[in-house]
Regions:
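Short, positively charged
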Residues: 1-11, 87-90
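Histidine-rich, glycine-flanked metal-binding segment
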Residues: 2-5, 13-62
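Conserved beta-strand segments that form the floor/walls of ligand-binding pockets within enzyme
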Residues: 7-8, 27, 67, 92
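Hydrophobic/aromatic beta-strand patches that form the interior of the parallel beta-sheet core
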Residues: 8, 52-54, 66, 122
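Metal-associated gating/positioning segment near the N- to mid-region
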Residues: 59-127
Length: 130
């Protein structure tokens, strides 16, 4: 099954190279960016009839952000002490503990991060007794 081309058009685009286009377009094919550029006088070119189009007029379009140090899912939102697995205190040194065992994948922090533009995160434990 052939996937349709996806076009995000009309939004203010921040590029990885530092260029900013007040009105631009992004063409995505098979999940990868194929082309992007500024829009001049409307659409970037005649769009394919079967293309999926997202009108981003008035919106900011930018690459996903990377959170390089966080405790998302380990220090859970709205859980208080019960949801805080950041620092384990059962022993003075706990090399046998892994942060992946403490992560709650349905923690609201992940949704909040996505809404803020974070698409990748390096999640680690606390440093109190590692």
């Amino acid at each position: 099954m052939e996937k349709k081309m996806l076009y995000i058009i009309g939004g203010k685009i921040l590029t990885m190279t530092g260029e900013i286009w007040d009105k631009g377009y992004i063409c995505i094919e098979n999940g990868k960016i194929k082309e992007l550029g500024p829009m001049v006088d409307g659409a970037p070119f005649p769009l394919p009839e079967d293309a999926l189009v997202i009108n981003a007029l008035g919106l900011l379009v930018m690459p996903g952000l990377i959170e390089a140090h966080c405790h998302m899912g380990i220090t859970e939102e709205k859980k208080g002490m019960e949801g805080d697995d950041c620092n384990e205190t059962v022993d003075p040194i706990t090399p046998y503990l892994r942060s992946m065992d403490a992560i709650n994948p349905i923690d609201a922090a992940f949704t909040d991060a996505l809404r803020a533009g974070i698409t990748s995160a390096m999640i680690g434990p606390g440093s109190a007794n590692v």
